[in-house]
Amino acid sequence: MKFVNCYNKLEIDRINDLVKTNPLLAKSEIEKYLAKYPNYDWGYVMQANILIVLGEVQKANEVLNALEEKVKSNKRLSKELRELYISKITYLRLRILAYNRNYDILYNFFSKNTEFITKEKLATEWLYTRIVTGNLNGEKLPGYLANQIANYNEVYFKNHIQKHFGVKTQDNSVFSENFPLEKVLEHLPNYLEQPGLFYDYFTDKYIFKLDGCGFASGIDTDLFEVITIHGTDHIINMYPTLEGTYTNSIDLNPILNKGYSRKISQIDKFNQRYKR
């Protein structure tokens, strides 16, 4: 997410990176940062975004309300900077509407604010909003995701992920030959009842752990991502990932691997050997 001048750019860059790799840690780190630099207003934009990713939308709205009041009352802000803040606050409030599935309100806003769609590059979100509210007016559905949002089909999903069962290369994500796809799909709905990580407007993201599940960018990994249509258990994509620092990954090993025992890290081995 774009940000304005900050007190410690390296720290802000690190937090921005954490939003994708470990949003729970990003939440903690931005709180610490704002405790040190409470006047860094863009930090509250970042904080609200992180809270939305984690599904804490009520807290996010409180942060945005306080920030909006502060921005509007700050007479020293330039017109350009004030407009930037208001634009980002609006963008995040729209994501809260999407998280709560208030799609009719979202549609009404987009239909009356086409310049905002262009400015924030939300043409795809505007299309999906028209789909879920039944306002396509005869438009053709372009692409896999649009069709799945309009009319979910599990067979299409299974066909779509076949590309992740091909030959391993340095650039792709592929599951291992013995990945138990059907068993995984049988158990996944049990973990999809609550929304996952919410990075956009219409999908949830979950991270699952299964030892030896596949490869990402040519590197072995025990983790894979599952993407669903927001608020449903309709899976639209899944693939191995290297984003292994998620603290809320879901471990499937005890269920799918009979006789499973946790892998012992080198640190654990050292501690066991020299424990006194």
List where the protein language model places each region.
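Alpha-helical segment of the N-proximal tetratricopeptide repeat
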Residues: 5-32, 36
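Start-of-helix register in tetratricopeptide repeats
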Residues: 9, 42, 81-84, 88
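Structural motif corresponding to the intra-repeat A-B loop/turn of tetratricopeptide repeats
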Residues: 20-21, 54, 100
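Alpha-helical repeat scaffolds
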Residues: 25-31, 58-70, 102-114
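Residue-level recognition of tetratricopeptide repeat
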Residues: 40, 74, 119-120
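Functional cores of ribonucleases/endoribonucleases
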Residues: 128-276
